[in-house]
């Protein structure tokens, strides 16, 4: 007999993880609101971050895959939640390392984010 997965519970947990990540991103971006021109908006679990040079970073959830996707000027990244962090499925780097680097490049300013 095949075991049925409780996808509702898994999806609820996924939404909690995504919400938590998006809130942390917002908090970190808000730390720099007086230093650099960064605008962001969130609609239907898609966060669009616009820098003063009009470059974008887009972060969105991929519910069927249980992933977070990050699109930057440099590349696109897919993250799975492993060991209490979002890990890139190609480089094994954590989300914050890649996101912080992309924001620093696209804003032309060294940004350091608090990940807690």
Swiss-Prot record:
The keyword Metal-binding applies. The keyword DNA-binding does not apply. Keywords: Iron, Metal-binding. It comes from the Bacteria. PROSITE patterns: FRATAXIN_1, FRATAXIN_2. GO terms for molecular function: ferric iron binding; ferrous iron binding. GO terms for biological process: iron-sulfur cluster assembly. GO terms for cellular component: cytosol. SMART domains: Frataxin_Cyay (SM01219). Gene3D superfamilies: Frataxin/CyaY (3.30.920.10). InterPro entries: CyaY, Frataxin/CyaY, Frataxin/CyaY_sf, Frataxin_CS. Involved in iron-sulfur (Fe-S) cluster assembly. May act as a regulator of Fe-S biogenesis. Belongs to the frataxin family. HAMAP family: CyaY. This is Iron-sulfur cluster assembly protein CyaY. It comes from Buchnera aphidicola subsp. Acyrthosiphon pisum (strain 5A). The lineage of its organism: Bacteria, Pseudomonadati, Pseudomonadota, Gammaproteobacteria, Enterobacterales. The gene is cyaY.
């Amino acid at each position: 007999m095949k075991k049925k997965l409780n996808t509702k519970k898994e999806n609820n947990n996924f939404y909690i993880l995504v919400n938590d990540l998006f809130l942390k991103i917002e908090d970190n971006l808000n730390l720099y609101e007086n230093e650099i021109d960064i605008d962001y908006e969130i609609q239907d679990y898609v966060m669009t971050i616009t820098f003063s040079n009009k470059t974008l970073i887009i972060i969105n959830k991929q519910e069927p895959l249980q992933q977070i996707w990050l699109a930057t000027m440099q590349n696109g990244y897919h993250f799975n939640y492993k060991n209490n962090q979002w890990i890139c499925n190609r480089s094994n780097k954590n989300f914050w390392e890649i996101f912080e680097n992309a924001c620093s490049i696209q804003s032309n300013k060294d940004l350091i984010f608090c990940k807690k």
